[in-house]
Amino acid sequence: MHTLAKSEDPAVEKGAPWGLARISHRDSLTFGTFNKYLYSSDGGEGVDVYVIDTGTNVDHVDFEGRASWGKTIPSGDEDKDGNGHGTHCSGTVAGKKYGVAKKAHVKAVKVLRSNGSGSMSDVVKGVEYAAESHIEQVEKAKKGKRKGFKGSAANMSLGGGKSALLDQAVNAAVDAGIHFAVAAGNDNADSCRYSPAAAEKAVTVGASTLADERAYFSNFGKCNDIFAPGLNILSTWIGSETATNVISGTSMASPHIAGLLAYLLSLQPSKNSAYAVAEITPKKLKADLLSIATVGALEDVPSDTANVSNSIFPCFRSVLTQIRSSPGTVVVLPTTPRSSPPVATRSRTRSASTVLRISRLSPRPTLPTRPTRRSRRWMLRSSVRT
């Protein structure tokens, strides 16, 4: 890692969504910090982020022209996000106001139709497209046709029953050099029973709340790598170039991590390698991400789940020094939950359905005691509050 090019002092976004504030403060948020995001103004520069979802409202002003359409996978569908889910995730990754990595470039990969449904084969094709596109960009950079390219990250805020095919596709994309974040799922269950949450080479992300608790719906277990803000998240939306919406889910947590991966990748020195222009591999950056995360900050985390959340020091010199000296691993002591739901111990077979659908938890003024049990279908990992 290297120090910041322009200044060691972070920029401060006032009036930021609470999720951005949380990832830039080690301690719990206070009245004075709950809406302040500390960041590098160059964060994400030179990095492509593939948002594999329902598409992206690429004309939204918050993207400042940094969002483009990659590919529409479903046959006969339009190059447009008619749902909003993908646009919301993209905004959290790279929006000027709502995003973690404010200079990253979003590439929309539409794998689900506007109603949120689609085939598992289309999702796999979307992952394969992202990997192939990344490899093409690496070759362009090595030939001097794309200067400043640092590499690629990806976000996948969808999932369903265990699918070896999808897990293999995601792991292969990571092997190709993409730094991948995936949602853990919203079933309040063991994330190892779902895909792509079980893809071991990706970063699997659970959802946390403003009160530093595991979100009541968030999956948990040994396949979880980290938690990130996922309840009542404000970001970009469809319908106009300025539309916004507040929604919840591990869908919202995962793009915080995808954005942070892009952010950290952009701080790497440019150097050709088998993975990307930045030499660091996805495996090493994942280890670095975990090494600078906060351990033991969350309540209601089952004892078999890593109590790790993506909060970092606002002092960027400290962060970069930690990454330089990181051994690449992190030891996490199990935390006894204050009042967490029991960890599932009974094995249950789930068929990997070929249909993906949106998972919408009922809008509510207060949190229910437990989420609605979902059928064996693939789904987007969000709920909508309008």
List where the protein language model places each region:
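Cationic, amphipathic, low-complexity alpha-helical segments enriched
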Residues: 312, 319-323, 329-386
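Structural recognition of the beta-strand scaffold that forms the well-ordered cores
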Residues: 48-52, 105-110, 152-157, 179-183, ...
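Substrate-binding/access-modulating region of protease and related hydrolase catalytic domains
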Residues: 43-44, 96, 111-201, 211-216, ...
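Hydrolase catalytic cores
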Residues: 90-93, 105-113, 128, 216, ...
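Catalytic-core environment of secreted peptidases
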Residues: 52, 57-63, 67-70, 80, ...
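Autoinhibitory propeptides
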Residues: 1-20
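Flexible, small-residue-rich helix->loop connector segments that border functional cores
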Residues: 52-62, 87-105, 109, 128-147, ...
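Acidic-leg catalytic submotif of subtilisin-like serine proteases
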Residues: 21-77, 154
